[in-house]
Regions:
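Beta-strand initiation motifs
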Residues: 21-26, 68-80, 121-126, 166-169, ...
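Short C-terminal beta-strands that terminate individual repeats in beta-propeller domains
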Residues: 82-86, 126-132, 169-173, 193, ...
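Canonical WD40 repeat/beta-propeller blade segments in eukaryotic WD-repeat proteins
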Residues: 1, 86-98, 131-142, 177-209, ...
Length: 344
């Protein structure tokens, strides 16, 4: 079995899930008998021989580089890996698809690109692109019927027939997020609704409910709610939460065939990514789906899994992570948005 792994520089690698003993051996580079001494490099020009402004600037940069010393070469990966493909922009998500015996790797990046590549061993072959996003893409999701859902910094989710690189539907997630915040009284007075931005932090597909209709759950960064959409229906059911949604897991129980375990931010105030809350709330919330399709909090599951919601804090060996460090770990999707006038 193979793991697909990507780095922020845009490269996607294949790694073995269970390496063989030979592959687990860390390859140590051969140590040279004597380290080659590198002579100090000196620019031939000096401040006495350079007169033009451009040349003086070049000389200054050369002298700065000499002061830093020679740059060390990048240390190679010391484990079995295979480079499959690369983007020229920061890569943000990867999904794997298999259709009629043929595999595909679907990747998204900060530059609004969705790329469809063949799977192993032909990942270097590009089948096509899904163009349409105007802001960064942060999440991809494949539905049971084979549709691709993408979202990021745009006002809409995009639903694709990715095999034909065709856009099928756009879902107005920004309006749903803003309405949820207004319902909970979390929109400050004077906020310009037209300029309100969202950042998609999670996309999850729900198992089909016997009606062959694709359904997805959506989380937006800094929003204390989950949004439940059905393909072809622009209306969203929103699940209000006690804190900002961080992650979702799905389980089945003898009582309920579909339950959600939702990790929430119990450090920051609901609807905020900067203000620290002064009340205590559990780290997890539990919801089960009713026969009418509605989601209600499930006290039975909450009791059964209470140890997870109020578990022991992680041991940080005395290191106190500052509030800004915690915030940067929890909220980093909006940072993908390009600012006017900023370098890409």
């Amino acid at each position: 079995m193979t793991i697909l792994c990507a780095d922020k520089f845009g490269d996607v690698y294949a790694l073995p899930l269970l390496p063989s003993p030979e592959e687990e051996k860390v390859e140590q580079p051969e140590a040279p008998a004597a380290e080659t001494e590198q002579k100090d490099w000196l620019p031939s020009a000096t401040t006495l021989t350079v007169h033009s402004g451009r040349n003086r600037k070049t000389l200054e940069e050369q002298l700065k580089q000499k002061a830093k010393g020679l740059a060390k070469s990048k240390e190679p990966m010391r484990f079995k890996h295979q480079l499959l493909l690369g983007h020229v922009s920061m890569l943000t998500d990867v999904v794997y698809a298999k259709v009629n015996g043929r595999s595909y790797i679907i990747t998204a990046d900060r530059d609004e690109h969705i790329r469809i590549s063949r799977g192993l061993p032909q990942a270097h072959i590009i089948e096509g692109f899904c163009f349409g996003h105007e802001a960064f893409i942060s999440k991809l999701c494949l539905t049971p019927s084979g549709l691709l859902v993408s979202g990021g910094g745009d006002d809409h989710l995009y639903v694709w027939d990715w095999q034909n690189c065709a856009l099928k539907e756009k879902i107005a997630i920004r309006d749903s997020a803003l309405a949820a915040l207004q319902t909970q009284g979390l929109v400050a007075p004077g906020v310009d609704h037209a300029s309100y931005k969202i950042a998609i932090s999670g996309l999850w597909t729900l198992p089909t409910n016997g009606n062959n209709v694709d359904e997805i759950l959506v989380a937006c960064e800094g929003v204390p709610a989950l949004f439940h959409f059905k393909m072809g229906d622009a209306h969203a059911n929103h699940i209000p939460l006690a804190g900002n949604a961080l992650d979702v897991a799905m389980i089945q129980t003898p009582i309920s065939p579909m339950c959600l375990i939702i990790s929430i931010d119990n450090i920051h105030k609901a609807g905020s990514t900067t203000e620290v809350r002064d009340d205590k709330v559990p780290r997890l919330q539990y919801f089960s789906r009713q026969a009418d399709g509605e989601w209600v909090e499930d006290a039975h599951i909450a009791t059964a899994l209470s140890g997870f919601a109020h578990g022991k804090e992680a041991d940080s060996n005395g290191l106190d992570a500052g509030e800004s460090v915690v915030r940067s770990m929890l909220y980093n999707v909006e940072n993908l948005r390009k600012r006017p006038g900023a370098d890409d």
